[in-house]
Design a protein with these regions (language model features):
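Active-site proximal loop and beta-alpha junction motif in alpha/beta enzyme cores
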Residues: 1-166
Length: 166
């Protein structure tokens, strides 16, 4: 489709890497709207080279703040997905986007892309491409098949600390 073509071009991917997933490109939100983009393989996800001007154009018409590309192929067997987050600024890839991971978890549950339970726990890997690996732990709570709550928490790499006195 035209949408897949424009998303693939903005991410520097082949269209087939998105089409092969048989999952839709969708805006999802748990407070911060993100464009969820399924990618077939971890190798393709790591090969993505975003074109930030095209990403900006892509997100403007969708009321989304960043692109959250993911694959179900992971580094750790316990993880549900591996993701990369790209904003429109293009300065640095976001290494641990909790709200985006929550949106991805809701997307995976609502599209039956994972085994669904009343409380579905989905660890999401992120940050490996920028040497700041993190695992974002998500829980999607269901009641009568409807998502009622999404909870996120994370284990990240500390890159600095400070103290502020007022």
């Amino acid at each position: 489709t035209d949408e897949v073509a424009s998303v693939a071009e903005a991410l520097g991917l082949a269209e087939e890497e998105i089409q092969a997933t048989n999952q839709p490109v969708r805006v999802a939100s748990t407070g911060l709207p993100v464009l969820i983009v399924p990618v077939a393989t971890l190798a393709a996800l790591f090969a993505a080279r975003p074109r930030y001007g095209l990403l900006r154009d892509l997100l403007e018409g969708r009321d989304a703040t960043l692109v959250y590309a993911f694959t179900k192929e992971t580094k750790e067997a316990r993880s549900a997905a591996h993701a990369r987050a790209f904003d429109t600024v293009g300065s640095v890839e976001v290494p641990g986007a909790g709200a985006a991971a929550g949106a991805l978890a809701a997307y995976l549950v609502s599209h039956n892309a994972v085994t669904v339970q009343p409380v579905t726990v989905l660890p999401i890997e992120q940050g490996h491409a920028v040497n700041r690996p993190s695992t974002i732990y998500t829980e999607v709570h269901l009641d009568s098949g409807e998502i009622t709550r999404v909870v996120m928490g994370a284990r990240v790499v500390r890159v600095g600390e400070g103290r502020l006195e007022i």
